[in-house]
UniProtKB/Swiss-Prot annotation:
Mg(2+) binds at D21, D23. It comes from the Bacteria. ATP binds at G8, R11, R92, R138, R141. It comes from Buchnera aphidicola subsp. Cinara cedri (strain Cc). The gene is cca. This is CCA-adding enzyme. Transmembrane segments: none annotated. Its EC number is 2.7.7.72.
């Protein structure tokens, strides 16, 4: 039995970037029970993966794969003792991830991964690459992860990604798996690259059809900005916001705000000016389909629906501002305001004079600070109301207090 360090740990070390986790492959083991005898814990259904009792790192048995179905899970695995290290590495996605190291520290590189690291190329190991649709998302993620180092996708690899998409195998990926890879893509230094790659290989059409639909469309906004591509501009904005915050909820919701501009409000006097349902509910359908976590979904939903209201928060009535605070439940979740402050970056209608100083967000936080202490508990001590009476009277008190403080707000901000 031999054990080798494989994959990302070696790649990252060769790139001189921090090693996040280490994975191992076990070659030549006759009976998987030998691992259990050494106190490893077995996980995984399709093939045995063992967790080290002390380091908690993953040890996988060397294996080969044979396509026998569709999607990411349609494979038969052979993890018998005759499987060699080279056979195991050959099934991996990229050459830069198919490098191994033995116990003496010797690097084993059957597929020229080191050479591709030097050339900064993301290249598939073999043509079996095309059998797993998840690899389309993985390569998009690696492109985003390593783009700041100058890495790019090899032409033949991109062609195989397009081939996978043309076979419609992406449709067999579970929403959970799509979101997991997207989450990782959003966590990189350049998350906009993730979506650009998905579009370039036609994967966006299957994974995010709502975004893909608007990718090439241009829109008339005003006399100063006659035509703009909303999605591509939003990707530029996503790149900018990613330099300011690592919060993926902010990054993703910030990017998706372009949906608001797809459907211009027909009449400024309508209630849509407060919360614009049409783009918000289009987004909501996508969020539900992809089973995106509730907290992330709510932030995206609020930012899109309340986009215009928040862009004009300085002229809103006290009643509407308190109503907004109630809807987003800021009394129990004040951190949501810390996510909303980034809205000041994103305003198509002021592209020429954008200072990006978070003025609107600061104003919003200041407004909340003036009335946040008017809580249910403090109110109950002074009033003897019950049930809905408490809610209604508390709301009236907040609105009245806010009206009285409006002049103070203007003086402090300006």
């Amino acid at each position: 039995m031999k054990i080798y360090l494989v994959g990302g740990a070696i790649r990252d070390r060769l790139l001189n970037i921090p090693v996040r986790d280490r994975d191992w492959v076990v070659v030549g083991i006759r009976d998987p029970k030998e691992m259990l005898k050494k106190n490893y814990q077995q996980v995984g259904k399709g093939f045995p993966v063992f967790i080290h009792p002390k380091t908690h790192e993953e040890y996988s048995l060397a294996r080969t794969e044979k396509k026998n179905g569709v999607g990411h899970t349609g494979f038969l695995f052979d993890f018998s003792s005759r499987i060699t290290l080279k056979e195991d590495l050959k099934r991996r996605d990229l050459t830069i991830n198919a490098i191994a190291q033995d116990s003496s520290g010797k690097i084993i590189d059957f597929f020229n991964g080191k050479k591709d690291i030097q050339k900064k190329i993301l290249r598939h190991v073999s043509y079996s690459f095309q059998e797993d649709p998840l690899r389309v998302l993985r390569i998009a993620r690696f492109a985003a992860l390593l783009s700041h180092l100058g890495f790019y996708i090899a032409k033949k690899t991109l062609s195989l990604m397009k081939l996978i998409c043309s076979r419609k195998e992406l449709l067999y990926l579970t929403p959970e798996r799509i979101w997991k890879e997207t989450q990782k893509g959003l966590s990189t230094q350049n998350p906009h690259v993730y979506f650009q790659v998905l579009y370039s290989c036609n994967a966006l059409f299957f994974l995010f059809p709502e975004i893909n639909y608007f990718y090439k469309k241009t829109y008339f906004l005003n006399s100063f900005i006659k035509h703009i591509n909303l999605v591509q501009y939003s990707l530029i904005e996503l790149s900018k916001i990613s330099k300011v915050t690592k919060d993926i909820n902010i990054r993703f919701s910030y990017f998706l705000q372009f949906f608001y501009y797809v459907y211009p409000i027909p009449n400024i006097g309508t209630k849509d000016y407060f919360f614009y349902k049409k783009p918000a509910f289009l987004l909501k359908k996508m969020l539900i389909r992809l089973k995106i976590p509730k907290e992330t979904s709510e932030i995206i939903f609020f930012l899109c629906g309340f986009h215009n209201f928040l862009q004009n928060i300085n002229i809103q009535s006290s009643k509407l501002i308190i109503k907004f605070f109630n809807i987003i439940d800021v009394w129990r979740k004040p951190n949501r305001l810390n996510q909303l402050i980034y809205l000041d970056f994103y305003n198509f209608n002021s592209l020429k004079n954008k200072k990006n100083d978070f003025f609107l967000g600061k104003l919003l936080k200041y407004m909340f600070s003036l009335i946040k202490d008017i809580s249910v508990c403090s109110f109950i001590k002074e009033k003897k109301f019950k049930g809905i009476e408490i809610k209604n009277d508390l709301n009236r008190l907040r609105i009245q207090s806010f009206k009285e403080m409006k002049e103070k707000i203007i003086l402090n901000i300006f």
